[in-house]
Amino acid sequence: AFPEELPRDVISQIFASAADVVREAGGTIAGGHTIRNPEPIFGLAVQGVVNPNNIFRKSGALAGDIALLSKPLGTGVVTAAGTDAEKRTAIAGMRTLNRRAAESLQEVHEAVHAVTDVTGYGLAGHGWEIADRSGVSLVIDTANLPLYDGALRLAQSGHRTGGDARNRLYVEGRITISADDALVALCFDPQTSGGLLAAVAPDSVRDLVSSGLWTRVGEFVDATPGIVLR
């Protein structure tokens, strides 16, 4: 949906850029519908066929699995209050697909027990979803978190997004915190185009981390389902 006064070349650039990303992801745009609207609205619906044996689910993490994250944290706070340079770095990360990370998991498919993407609920919220569905607890080592430029500085200065408070409520009563306040805040920071969070058997972790696509951020332990930030 686009306003009538929006130049046609701008609309063409939006469609062309979307097509480029879809091709990069291995897809094809087929059809569409455009209407007039005072504000621009653009989105895609994805359809596909998948081998049911190759689906990664939120459930299935085992005690002893290592938690790996494929992108830095901090898009929420950086895009809200970061410098122009910091925003550019975060946007570049947001524009990067998770395809390579997902393909690397397929290479060790049997060792991957659960996967989700880190988006609006932040690392803590989406980590809780895996822990809850798997019947284990997720311990996050906040000192190991990969962060976008400026994210820690902004969090230390007290910058928070509106999603921070909502995400804390989402895991209220299910979380134990003993970490630095700023790093805790980044675990609750809502992400746009965040990375994948994977529960992986220890024997396969070294190769994934050495690929440069993944960072070890914690482990799943045999305990009442919950989240520990330490």
Task: For the regions a language model picked out, list residue spans one by one.
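Short hydrophobic/aromatic-rich motifs at helix boundaries and adjacent loops
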Residues: 72-76, 96-100, 123-124
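Active-site glycine-rich loop that binds ribose-phosphate moieties when present
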Residues: 45-55, 86-108, 181
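Generic alpha-helical secondary structure signal
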Residues: 9, 84-88, 92, 99, ...
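Phosphate-binding glycine-rich loops and adjacent basic patches that engage nucleotide phosphates
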Residues: 59-69, 84-92, 112-116, 166-174
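Glycine-/charge-enriched secondary-structure boundary and capping motifs
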Residues: 5-28, 35-42, 53, 107-112, ...
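Glycine-rich phosphate/pyrophosphate-binding loop regions near the starts of catalytic domains
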Residues: 1-88
